Amino acid sequence: PTVWKAFDEWTAILAGDALLTLAFDVLARETTHRDPAIRIALVQAMARASGAAGMVGGQALDLMADKLGDPRTPTADHIRRLQAMKTGALLVYACEAGAILGHAPEAERKALVEFGTALGLAFQIADDLLDAEGDAATVGKAVAKDAAAGKATLVSLMGIPAARQMLAETEARANAALAPFSTKADILRAAARFVVARKS
């Protein structure tokens, strides 16, 4: 079960606050990297990914839609933006952090950010498809929740066939971003395949 189900909402909120604060503590430690410039870059990238321009901002957009009905008629662009911030930003960070730690050139860092962006979108589309057409026993959680709640997703907006097509195109875009790395990025290609093909 989720934390708020196992305990309660205030425990879940405080646990989230504590874990986010811990992330900055870990990144700032000398044991994370001996070069202070690298640690600063990691902290800055995490701040962007987790703050108003990332996870927290995306969650705010999601709550505005859920609780206030704003916007009244979400567009595909709005949903993509919300999902990129709420879910995708931390996946992008994981990719960018690797580039920072590896002293990657700017072009390679941008390529990994592009990969992470596509991976985040693919994850969300796949998740929405599982909710729309999966069965609870296989998925491992309740399904059809979005439709029951009247929540706008790319699947509800475009339909399942178009969402599947977008998922395939997004995986292709993720793989294209990895072209500069040749076979060294095969593990990332496998990660994208896993995200797209997962059944739970």
Q: Where is each model-derived feature located?
A:
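Mg2+-dependent prenyl diphosphate-binding active-site environment of isoprenoid biosynthetic enzymes
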Residues: 1-126, 132-176, 186-196
